[in-house]
Design a protein with these regions (language model features):
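Terminal targeting signals and extreme-terminal segments of soluble enzymes
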Residues: 2-344
Length: 344
């Protein structure tokens, strides 16, 4: 695969305006079958030394899904690092919305290389727009004592839980009016599977005292055990999937169709042990605070055997609240779908 030479690293560019649409174009690049993350997350070297991907995975706002950007940035960094060590930390800033159908260009610059650690900086761009900035750190690993927090007690195994898609089908009468395109795609990804714990409570009830969301997730298309970089990038892809909604639990009842514009601002993943995303992983997510329209979500990721394999943190933007006469806030909700605009 050959890509044209692009001059230099483009300057950071602000988004022209906030993207508040909730009626997106949900298409993805036809060269990706929406199943194989090995295709979606792959990057190819260009003649200019950067890495490129033509593949797109659109979110519900019609922009590039953040997990795709995290995973592709990790793969670009791993290619530049030549597989000398696994990733131990990824720190990302999402700078502007990515546009589906426009190739991503990843410029990688080595910040540090030591005997056991190295750090690669990745800038992901579309033309003059900088979409993502990431620092990806690698560590060879060293022998040392280990400790893990215990897996939460009382969590049902994934085999006893319904998929997110099935929960939404079973609870269709609880869903607010949604555009048909959005309703058809909710929880209907073919690349990963998510099975929430206590799904109805989280999706449709408000807990004013704490924010907690537990769910099992895995990749559906097998990834070869020797493809360590891709396995880690696949967890990067998974790490943004439904995770930001954790911070909404104390604020709203129904988490779907709020009418809010939700966007990832920054995102971090720490890899503690080798991870196999083909197997079920338990995400135990909480949120300590939401303020100034920003919510922080954190999570511990457990393997099926109970080991802590990763930790996550993400700050998200929740924009569009309406304020009543008493100073309280509520989500605006979605407009009623109409046959005239093809959403019924």
């Amino acid at each position: 695969m050959t890509f044209p030479v692009s001059p230099g690293v483009p300057p950071v560019h602000r988004a022209e305006s906030p993207i508040n649409t909730v009626v997106p174009e949900l298409g993805s690049d036809p060269s990706w079958d929406r199943k194989d993350l090995g295709v979606l997350l792959s990057v190819a070297p260009g003649e200019d030394g950067a890495f490129y991907s033509p593949h797109s995975d659109a979110n519900m706002h019609g922009t590039l899904y953040g997990g795709q950007l995290v995973g592709q940035a990790m793969m670009a960094a791993a290619e530049a690092n030549r597989g000398s060590a696994p990733v131990h930390c990824v720190q990302v800033n999402f700078l502007t919305a990515g546009k589906p159908g426009v190739p991503m260009r990843y410029e990688v610059r080595q910040l540090m290389r030591g005997l056991n650690f190295s750090v690669q900086q990745v800038l992901g761009t579309q033309g003059t727009r900088t979409v993502i900035s990431a620092n990806v750190s690698f560590h060879r690993g060293e022998p040392a004592p280990e400790f893990s927090s215990a897996m939460p007690e009382g969590v049902p195994p994934p085999e006893e839980l319904r998929s997110l898609r099935q929960v939404l089908i079973d609870c269709a009468d609880l869903l607010p009016p949604l555009p048909t395109l959005v309703k058809d795609r909710l929880g209907n990804t073919r690349s990963v599977e998510l099975r929430p714990v206590d799904a109805e409570r989280f999706l449709f009830e408000r807990n004013r005292k704490q924010a907690r969301f537990r769910y099992w997730a895995r990749v559906l298309e097998p990834i070869a055990p020797q493809a360590q970089a891709l396995q880690q990038a696949a967890l990067g892809y998974l790490s943004d999937y439904w995770f930001p909604l954790t911070a909404l639990e104390p604020l709203v009842g129904t988490k779907l169709g709020t009418g809010l514009y939700i966007a990832s601002l920054n995102h971090s993943v720490w890899f503690h042990r080798p991870v196999n995303p083909n197997e079920w992983l338990l995400f135990d997510a909480t949120s300590p605070c939401t303020a100034n329209a920003r919510g922080l979500s954190t999570a511990t990721v457990y393997s099926r055997s109970g080991d802590v394999v990763a930790s996550l943190a993400q700050e998200s933007l929740f924009r569009g609240w309406t304020q009543d006469a008493e100073g309280g806030f509520m989500a605006p909700g979605l407009p009623e779908p109409s046959a005239e605009n093809g959403q019924a």
